[in-house]
Every structure is written in C-alpha cells, then in structure tokens.
C-alpha cells in the first residue's frame, strides 16, 4: 500500500510540475501581446511566488538536515543561494516597478553574483558522497564542455559594439565565467543520472542549473545588444529554472525525510 501511495504521489507531483511549467509558459507568452507597462508588471510579479517557493523549501530542508554531514552543509549552501537570488529578484522588481529605473546594472547584480559560489559549493558537497562513481574522464569532459561554452560567450561580450560602458562589460563578462563554473558539476550530475547513479529528482536541480546558464547567456547577449526587455521569452527560462529548483528540493524533502543523519545510507534510494 505504501509503495502504491508513493507512486501516486510521484505521478501527481510530476503532473503538477508539468502544469506549473506549462502555465508559466502560457503566462509569459500572453504578456508579450500586452502593452509594455502591463507586461513588465506581470513578468516582475512572477518573480515573487516562484523564487519564493524555492526559498521557502530550501529553508525547510536546510533546517531539517541542519549542519550535520556533507548533505546538511550542501542544503545550507543552497538556502544561502535561494536567499541571495530571491533578494536579487525583489531588488530588480522594486527598482523597475517602484523607482522606474533600469535595474541593470544595479545592486541586484551583487546578489545574483553572490549566489553562484553558493551554488557551486552546494553541487560539490552534494556530489561528494558519489565521488566513486565520478571518473576523471567525466570531470574532464564536463570541464571541456563548460569552457567551450564560456569562450564564445566571453568573446562576444568584448567584441560587441553596444553602448555598454567598461563597468557594464566587466559585470556582464563575470556571468559567463560563473556560469561555466556551476555548469561543470551540473553536467556531471546529469551524466550520473543516465548511468543510473542518481535519481530524476537530483537531475531536476542539475537541469535547473543548465537552464539558468542558457538563460544567462541569452540575457547577456540581448542586454549587450540593447534588445532585452522585461517579459522577453528568455525570462521564461529563468522562471522554469526556479520551478525545477523548487520541485527538486521538494522531492528531496520527501525522499530523505527518514534519512536525516545519513541520507546516503542506502545509495539505491537515489536511483
């Protein structure tokens, strides 16, 4: 009975995830047919409940596991990431909706950039218990892919003929560097999923990282080209990334609730 109930919960959760992704996609498509003021308002407001859900869930799981072991430390780092990025989103919204100023570059970038070291450290701590399944070849391939993506993006920033000043160029170029940093462990995590070493729920988080990297790259190119606007389709990738993060954390809370002291005591439960 418990097994059947667990399966039903997973099916319902996956349906809710799919519904959330589709609903968010529909809203972002719809706002692009509205006037710019309404589009900006609705798009900015979406960054309250969606990153907010990620924040609340990350605090719940961080409190649940505490600072015990690598897994506990990992979730504390993830909670710090969530706080940092949620703060950044609210600063962006306030500057754009209340103060009517361009939120890029702004204080929001400080909190966006601050989140990346937390995300990288979280990924490392989380993958450490699986280090025996991670080969040097896998690390090398993931690193090469990350660098391969970094170089052209970095190059385009400096070769751009946009009106951005030196500070904006340096600020913009720091995003692809940090994206490459977090992309490497995410690719390792996805590879482990296809090898059967980790479950789909951990892959949600890795997928969220990849989506965020793609969104960052798109946002960067559009901003340098002065063609970005709030509500642009690229924003959907950021929102989807937050949703995947939130659902990944939620499912981890469900899976590991009975393994607080040693969530990797039975490694098969990750598969």
Name these PLM-found stretches.
Residues 1-271:
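Polytopic alpha-helical membrane-helix bundles and their juxtamembrane interface segments
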């Amino acid at each position: 009975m418990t097994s059947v109930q667990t399966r039903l919960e997973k099916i319902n959760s996956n349906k809710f995830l799919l519904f959330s992704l589709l609903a968010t996609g529909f809203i972002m498509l719809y706002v692009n047919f509205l006037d710019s003021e309404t589009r900006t308002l609705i798009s900015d407001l979406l960054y309250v409940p969606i990153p907010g859900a990620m924040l609340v869930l990350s605090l719940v799981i961080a409190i649940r596991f505490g600072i015990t072991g690598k897994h506990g430390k990992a979730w504390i780092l993830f909670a710090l990431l969530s706080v940092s990025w949620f703060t950044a989103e609210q600063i962006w919204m306030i500057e754009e909706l209340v103060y009517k100023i361009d939120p890029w570059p702004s204080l929001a970038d400080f909190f966006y950039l601050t989140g990346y070291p937390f995300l990288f450290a979280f990924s490392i701590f989380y993958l450490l218990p699986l280090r025996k399944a991670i080969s040097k070849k896998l690390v090398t391939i993931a690193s090469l892919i990350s660098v391969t993506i970094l170089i052209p993006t970095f190059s385009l920033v400096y070769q751009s003929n946009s009106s951005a000043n030196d500070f904006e160029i340096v600020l913009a170029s720091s995003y692809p560097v940090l994206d490459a940093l977090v992309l490497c462990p995410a690719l390792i995590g996805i590879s482990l999923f296809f090898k059967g070493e980790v479950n789909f729920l951990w892959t949600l988080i890795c997928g969220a990282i990849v989506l965020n990297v793609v969104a960052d790259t798109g946002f960067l190119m559009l901003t340098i080209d002065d063609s970005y606007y709030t509500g642009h389709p690229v924003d959907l990738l950021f929102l989807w990334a937050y949703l995947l993060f939130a659902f990944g954390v939620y499912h981890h809370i469900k899976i590991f609730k009975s393994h607080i002291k040693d969530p990797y005591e039975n490694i098969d439960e990750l598969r």
